[in-house]
A protein has these predicted regions:
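Generic structural signal for secondary-structure transition and capping sites
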Residues: 37-38, 84, 132, 153
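Short beta-strand segments
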Residues: 36-71, 77-79, 87-91, 97-99
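Short, basic/aromatic recognition patches
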Residues: 18-39
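Structural motif corresponding to alpha-helix initiation and N-cap regions
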Residues: 26, 72-73
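Charged, gly/pro-rich active-site loop segments
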Residues: 2-21, 100-171
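A short, polar/proline- and glycine-enriched secondary-structure boundary/capping micro-motif
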Residues: 76-82, 166-168
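Short N-terminal helix-initiation segments at or just after the protein's N-terminus
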Residues: 1-7, 28-32, 48-58, 86-97, ...
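Short, intrinsically disordered, mixed-charge
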Residues: 72, 81-85, 125-133
């Protein structure tokens, strides 16, 4: 079966191996996603891309990320139509002289609407622990909680050095 989330990298390039062997790459990705509180959620619909800012929380193993959105939004509708998503998280500075220090991660995966129940409660707790101000928003019946199962991360430094990391059971 073809993975619908295949990267554009040439599989034979040593620089772009499916699983980067640098043990610090996972740690750099972890640090970045734990330090930043917001991501740009990238979705698509009708052949058009759409980006939206979301507050997020990753699972400890980096295999899942969770966010909440109102159900009466374009974001919710597009997530309901297509589960292929990406989240872009970066360390963008406010000063131009720090521009080459920017790191960015694109996490690609499949989104899942989480129905109220045990899993909803566990994931809501994860998100609220990171963003306590979202508690009433997360619990509102007019909002939906989504979990994204991460397929891979693309880590970028200095605007052109790209490596990928795939979370596994052995993270």
């Amino acid at each position: 079966m073809v993975n619908q989330d295949e990267p554009l990298f040439d599989r034979n390039s040593p620089m772009n191996s499916p699983q980067d062997s640098d043990p610090t790459l996972r740690d750099r990705i972890r640090r970045l996603v734990m330090e930043q509180e917001y991501a740009v959620l990238c979705v698509q619909g009708g052949g058009q891309p759409y980006g939206a800012l979301v507050a997020f929380a990753f699972s400890e193993d980096l295999r899942h990320v969770v966010f909440v959105t109102p159900t009466a939004t374009r974001k919710y509708r597009l997530l309901s139509e297509c589960d292929h998503v990406a989240l872009v998280i970066d360390s963008r500075p406010n000063k131009i002289d720090q521009l080459m220090d920017v790191e960015a991660v694109t996490a690609t995966g499949r989104s899942h609407l989480i129905e109220r129940g045990v899993e909803f409660d566990e994931l809501a707790e994860l998100l609220i622990a990171r963003h306590p101000y979202l508690k009433s928003f997360v619990q509102a019946t007019t909002c939906a909680l989504f979990r994204v199962d991460i397929v891979r991360f693309f880590h970028v430094v200095r605007f052109q050095e790209v490596r990928q990391w795939i979370p596994t059971d052995h993270c």
